[in-house]
Amino acid sequence: MANLIETGEYMNIRGKKLYVETHGNPKNKPVLYLHGGPGESCYDFSFHQAERLKGSLYVIMIDQRGVCRSEEITEDEAFGLNDLIEDCEELKKVLQIEKWSIIGHSFGGYVALLYASIYPSSIEKIIFEGPTFDFALTSRALLQKTGHLLKKYGKEEVAEESLAYSSSDASSEELLEAYIRLSAELEEKRMEIYNNKEDRTDESLYSDEEWEIFSNRSKIHFDRLKLEGACHTSLLSKIKDVQNLMLLIVGKHDVVTCEEQIKTFNKDARNGKYIVFEESGHSPHYEEADRFAETVIHFLK
């Protein structure tokens, strides 16, 4: 079911080259995929979902500003969270789309909710896949899981530190930095924080050297977002104001969308639906790819 050809093109969006893929008939209902990370790219989503979705939808996927295959952000230019929203809005105009739906994975779910709160009339429906709406809550949950995994692999000292952080009153910024530092201690086991099933994405479309360049760009993107700090604002209070139909998809084994965030969504979403993917961790789009595609098509039709 996979794409191993580069199907994207470069589009000039608000003074920057963005990598954009489109799949399916433009007459189909349009949906924009927003990747997580920050800085993850749409590569794995395209690899697993482009073929599955393109018969029913018009799927647009991007590497966000400064990420992976998109043009890098330079030191002397202004960049912040809001640029990600404005890029979406501009891309929509360039593609001559009046309204589109959004799939937001992980941090992409955060961006999607922010987008809907700023430009509600641009958006039809929203699918959140393992989203975060609150960086502090997500970092706490991730630190807790990291602590348990570190313990499992015999790293007692850092495990204790991780668990202590998760229940401390540290700021959202401090929690994120602690998580980045402590999860790195898991080394090659780090993806166990996220995956229930192994990620079978074939990355051979690009060379190791190319992936390294992409990864460096993405790091700048993430660092600049952290420096700006706007992403540390909780968006949980915005859920109640969204009129759009929303679907929350969470993998049973994922902690990114922690209980408190799920509870708030279920309580506050006016037009919200919640589905658990029993076999998935953080990425149902590849852990249960067929079910994910069917769910998306059914919800957006």
Mark where each language-model region is.
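Hydrophobic, aromatic-rich cap/lid helix
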Residues: 192-199, 204-234
